A protein has these predicted regions:
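Peripheral (often C-terminal) accessory segments that flank ATP-dependent C-N-forming ligase machineries
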Residues: 264-355
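Active-site nucleotide/adenylate-binding loops and adjacent lid/helix of ATP-dependent enzymes
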Residues: 78-163, 167-213
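Short, flexible active-site loops
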Residues: 187-196, 238-251
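Short, low-complexity Ser/Thr-rich regulatory SLiMs
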Residues: 166-170, 227-231, 306
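ATP-binding N-terminal substructure of ATP-dependent carboxylate-amine bond-forming enzymes
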Residues: 1-85, 104
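Active-site "cap" helix and flanking loop/linker of ATP-utilizing ligase/carboxylase catalytic domains
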Residues: 204-225, 230, 241-288
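Conserved protein kinase catalytic/activation segment
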Residues: 233-235
Length: 355
């Protein structure tokens, strides 16, 4: 039996473990503070569900492990500075940017990047945290500790957000899912919609960009690339060197889920192109109590993470997929009264994509 240890034991590790069971792969998600002797890592392949981690007895041990897949890639992608430098090195389209070294640079920043600046911490920060949207009169609100530790990007006037989830095998072969349309609110992914066939030009551009990144990094496994849709084409926003929230629809909408695909890639199993037969919608459950009435709707697949429910916390997701988009839209409509009011706008957005 193949064994995989996952650095991190959140919902991504949980879903990787679930995906491993039918394949006969024993998957062990482990907390960062676990005692090394309690973790069966000696004969395991090592992967991670997070981009960065503190130094602990376990992480020190795993950092030396010869089968830690992509070990040297995580630091590059975890730092937005080196991630942006990678895009520039490969001549890949991304928002104009620079390192923000001191407050003295602000006049030049707005001259170069325009009236809206997006400031992001180089490391950490996700789901909208550690980011600021600033105009020239608002720079005083940026914490002093950001200077030297943040990048600043041009605010992009985009018409939509999409992501590409793909995987690369040890032999260099790559496979990709269709582009996923994503709706973020307050920086948090709320809803995703995917179709068997994406826009051909966008799909080709996205695959070329992510393929170049995977090859340059000699990456193995699943990676996600988030992009802005603009009149000139796609601009890369950020990378995630792991399975990704916007790929959760693949659990019920693809012949091979992103979780199974990642395990196949890192363990050297066959990596065929996943087949997608019908449109899919994913609704993130954020700070919402479990409601089994969702399951009264026959298209709904519930994925509950068994986490304490807190405001702003991802605690599960709902997947829906059906070849009949009218039936899919009607099921979304039936979900509205079963969810808190803040879900209505995301469901309306998904329905508009299905038209």
């Amino acid at each position: 039996m193949k064994q995989v240890c996952i650095l991190g034991n959140g919902q991504l590790g949980r879903m990787l473990r679930q995906a491993g069971e039918p394949l006969g792969i024993a998957v062990w998600p482990v907390g960062l503070d676990a005692e090394p002797e309690a973790v069966p890592f000696a004969q395991s392949i090592i992967t991670a569900e997070i981009e960065r981690w503190p130094e602990t007895a376990l992480t020190r041990e795993l950092a030396r492990h010869p089968a830690f897949v992509n070990r040297d890639v995580f630091p590059i992608i975890a730092d937005r500075l080196t991630q942006k430098q990678l895009f520039d090195k490969l001549n890949l389209a991304t928002a104009p940017w620079q390192l923000l070294a001191s407050a003295d640079e602000w006049p030049g920043v707005f001259d170069r990047l325009g009236e809206l600046a997006i400031v992001k911490r180089r490391v950490g920060g996700y789901d909208g945290r550690g980011q600021w949207r600033l105009r020239a009169t608002e720079t005083a609100q940026l914490p002093d500790d950001c200077y030297g530790e943040c990048i600043v990007e041009q605010g992009i006037n985009f018409s939509g957000e999409v992501s590409l989830v793909g995987a690369r095998g040890h032999d260099g072969s790559t496979v990709f899912y269709p582009l996923t349309h994503n709706l973020h609110q307050d920086g948090i992914l709320r809803t995703s919609v995917a179709f068997p066939q994406a826009n051909a030009a966008q799909q080709a551009q996205a695959e070329a960009m992510l393929g170049a990144i995977l090859s340059e990094l000699n990456y193995v496994g699943v990676m996600a690339m988030e992009c802005f849709v603009t009149p000139a084409g796609l601009l890369i926003n950020e990378l995630a060197p792991r399975v990704h929230n916007s790929g959760h629809w693949t659990q019920n909408g693809a012949s091979i889920s992103q979780f199974e695909l990642h395990l196949r890639a890192i363990t050297g199993l066959p990596l065929p192109q996943p087949v997608i037969n019908s449109p899919s919608v994913m609704v993130n459950l954020i700070g919402t109590d479990l409601n089994y009435d969702w399951l009264k709707l026959p298209l709904v697949h519930l994925h509950w993470y068994d986490k304490e429910v807190r405001p702003g916390r991802k605690v599960g997701h709902l997947n829906l997929n059906d070849a009949d988009t009218d039936r899919l839209s009607a099921t979304l409509e039936a979900l509205v009264p079963l969810l808190p009011p803040e879900y209505a706008s995301g469901i309306t957005w998904a329905q508009s994509k299905l038209l």
